[in-house]
Curated annotation (Swiss-Prot):
Role noted for this protein: Plays a key role in the nitrogen metabolism of microorganisms, animals and plants.
Record's protein name: Glutamine synthetase 2 isozyme
GO molecular function, a single term: ATP binding
Oligomer status and interactors: Homohexamer.
Family: Belongs to the glutamine synthetase family.
Subcellular location: Plastid, Chloroplast
EC identifiers of the protein: 6.3.1.2
Taxonomic source organism: Emiliania huxleyi
Length: 25
C-alpha cells in the first residue's frame, strides 16, 4: 500500500469501532 492510504484505513477503522462502541454505550 500506499502508506497514506493504509493510515487512512486505520483511522477509518478506529472511527468505526469508536462509533459502534458509543452506539452500544
Amino acid at each position: 500500500x500506499i502508506a497514506g492510504s493504509e493510515e487512512y484505513g486505520k483511522h477509518c477503522f478506529k472511527g468505526a469501532v469508536a462509533d459502534a462502541y458509543l452506539a452500544k454505550h
